[in-house]
């Protein structure tokens, strides 16, 4: 393998310009997400979610974006997970969408709050049966002795709910992220990337700045 310091490539798929940038960051995000889906990217809704605990220790993990509604980015998770526990003590959050094939990325910085239970139940009911059962099976981030033990818990859960509707567990919920900043990055030749930062001024207005790469 060649040295890691020598692994690089040029970015040459295009430019993001003042003329092509949409004035609404949500519309720009929707356009880029549609481009990612159209390009056949695997897991185009996958995003890195960064949180910080009460001791100031950051953590990251990949989570799937499930909606953008009412100006908020939405995802769901076990409320006992590290990310949920972090957010319940420190609501600051960062999302990162890495669309490598398109030489694009989007950064979202803001604050998270819990979704209402009726929204959680509505989404939970739309999930595949196996995903509903898995949510009840897993005490996310807790130790377990083996995969066989996990599968045994899953089978027990299937029996428990074999003849009834499956409600959303109380320990499972969703978060909505209200962004304060949304940054769009397009790779450029000679590492002269295009970066535009939307910063929230109030509930409906954003300032826009081009940033140096």
UniProtKB/Swiss-Prot annotation:
Substrate binds at residues 8-11, 66, 123, 127, 131, 191-193. It comes from the Bacteria. FMN binds at residues 61-66, 76-77, 82-83, 105, 140-141, 185, 195. Its EC number is 1.4.3.5. It holds the Pfam family PNPOx_N. Binds 1 FMN per subunit. Its cofactor is FMN. GO terms for biological process: pyridoxine biosynthetic process. It catalyses: pyridoxamine 5'-phosphate + O2 + H2O = pyridoxal 5'-phosphate + H2O2 + NH4(+); pyridoxine 5'-phosphate + O2 = pyridoxal 5'-phosphate + H2O2. The keyword GTP-binding does not apply. Signal peptide: none annotated. GO terms for molecular function: FMN binding; pyridoxamine phosphate oxidase activity. Pathway: Cofactor metabolism; pyridoxal 5'-phosphate salvage; pyridoxal 5'-phosphate from pyridoxamine 5'-phosphate: step 1/1; Cofactor metabolism; pyridoxal 5'-phosphate salvage; pyridoxal 5'-phosphate from pyridoxine 5'-phosphate: step 1/1. Keywords: Flavoprotein, FMN, Oxidoreductase, Pyridoxine biosynthesis. Homodimer. Catalyzes the oxidation of either pyridoxine 5'-phosphate (PNP) or pyridoxamine 5'-phosphate (PMP) into pyridoxal 5'-phosphate (PLP). Belongs to the pyridoxamine 5'-phosphate oxidase family. This is Pyridoxine/pyridoxamine 5'-phosphate oxidase. The lineage of its organism: Bacteria, Pseudomonadati, Pseudomonadota, Gammaproteobacteria, Alteromonadales.
């Amino acid at each position: 393998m060649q040295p890691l310091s020598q692994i690089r490539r040029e970015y040459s798929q295009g430019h993001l310009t003042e003329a092509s940038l949409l004035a609404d960051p949500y519309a720009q995000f929707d356009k880029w997400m549609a481009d990612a889906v159209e390009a056949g990217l695997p897991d185009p809704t996958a995003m890195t979610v960064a949180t910080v605990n009460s001791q100031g220790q950051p953590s990251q993990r990949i989570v799937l974006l499930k909606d953008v509604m009412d100006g908020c980015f939405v995802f769901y998770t076990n409320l006992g997970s590290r990310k949920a526990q972090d957010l319940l003590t420190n609501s600051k959050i960062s999302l990162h969408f890495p669309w490598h094939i398109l030489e694009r990325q989007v950064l979202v910085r803001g604050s998270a709050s819990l979704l209402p239970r009726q929204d959680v139940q509505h989404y939970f009911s739309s999930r595949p049966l196996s995903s509903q059962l898995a949510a009840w099976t897993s005490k996310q981030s807790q130790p377990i002795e083996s995969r066989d033990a996990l599968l045994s818990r899953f089978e027990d859960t299937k029996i428990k709910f074999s003849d009834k509707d499956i409600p959303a567990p109380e320990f499972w919920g969703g978060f909505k992220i209200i962004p304060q900043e949304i940054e769009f990055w397009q790779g450029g030749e000679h590492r002269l990337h295009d970066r535009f930062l939307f910063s929230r001024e109030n509930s409906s207005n954003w300032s826009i700045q081009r940033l140096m790469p």
